[in-house]
Amino acid sequence: MAAAAAAAAICGEDETAARVGCTGEWAGGIERVDLGERKEAVAAAGAGKRSVYLMDCAPVWGCASTRGRSAEMEDASAAVPRFADVPVRLLASRRDLDALGLDADALRLPAHLFGVFDGHGGAEVANYCRERIHVVLSEELKRLGKNLGEMGEVDMKEHWDDVFTKCFQRVDDEVSGRVTRVVNGGGEVRSEPVTAENVGSTAVVALVCSSHVVVANCGDSRIVLCRGKEPVALSIDHKPDRKDERARIEAQGGKVIQWNGYRVSGILAMSRSIGDRYLKPFVIPKPEVMVVPRAKDDDCLILASDGLWDVVSNEEACKVARRQILLWHKNNGAASPLSDEGEGSTDPAAQAAADYLMRLALKKGSEDNITVIVVDLKPRKKLKNIS
């Protein structure tokens, strides 16, 4: 599988990067197969149309990142095409898959990962997340996949919660030095922490496949789906003054203090993160997860650190990204170039959108690092058949 060889596309200080998989139009016209659309999907399959679950699409994207007005660059990002194969039973019910004539136990969908990690106190944890989250997530998906055959009907949301929670907790344990390993003679040695106890990072991650987008968020980076002309927030910022977050912190004996904004113990301006072991158990690495079926009018995803979101609204970001992508294709043609391998090339349309958003945040006075990933979800070439 190409995921084994794929490395994360990294945006460092004042650099931009973009890589491409494949694009496509939904063959046969089935944009998504959801529980509420079972009859239509079955009818389409009977008419000779191909299910979205038999499509392989690596989305195209662009990434832009800058230190901005900050003294240090503490953001990191990752784009990893085909990092894992997802059991289709995590995306649809056995009943629906059987109705489509698909093997519910054997079928896997190629998945692609995008992530933004906004560090604080240093870049070490953000950089560690960039290198490790997709690896650990792939391992957790394989672990779950081995057990799916023994399960009955699967609660998709429950299993995705479990997969991402274990992934983020494992990375947090590694960062904090809470991992033990067996040495010669059978003894155990605890690993060293990656960095100081006051260093941490947000993590917002999107897993994209042909049928769904699955999002996990921990912290105050954000992901927004541009669906048609409307922004759809796929994450909710973890701020200490959020009612449920404040209640959780105070139930653990912690305090939320107003000190140049609401902060945990008067220090950290977010209520969840990876790292920050000096603020445990008040600051936790548990992500909130959302599973979203893809739709025909999905335009793009925007993942970004708060250097963008502090000065640009969801509505403006979607409007700008959509306009820049359309403008590029209007001036240069409908299709973006593809590499011979189907991944690893640049996508100038998505890159133009990411660059523009980064410059817009600077123009609006953002004082933080800014990292933006724009994932173009609009199909422009035929999808590859994986059946």
UniProtKB/Swiss-Prot annotation:
Belongs to the PP2C family. It is an enzyme of class 3 (hydrolase). PROSITE patterns: PPM_1 (PS01032), PPM_2 (PS51746). It catalyses: O-phospho-L-seryl-[protein] + H2O = L-seryl-[protein] + phosphate; O-phospho-L-threonyl-[protein] + H2O = L-threonyl-[protein] + phosphate. A motif (Modulates binding affinity to PYR/PYL/RCAR abscisic acid intracellular receptors) lies at residues 264-268. It comes from the Eukaryota. Interacts with PYL3, PYL5, PYL9 and PYL10. Binding to PYL3, PYL5, PYL9 and PYL10 is dependent on the presence of abscisic acid (ABA). Interacts with SAPK10. PANTHER family: PROTEIN PHOSPHATASE. Changing residue 267 to K: Abolishes interaction with PYR/PYL/RCAR abscisic acid intracellular receptors. This is Protein phosphatase 2C 50. Its EC number is 3.1.3.16. CDD domains: PP2Cc.
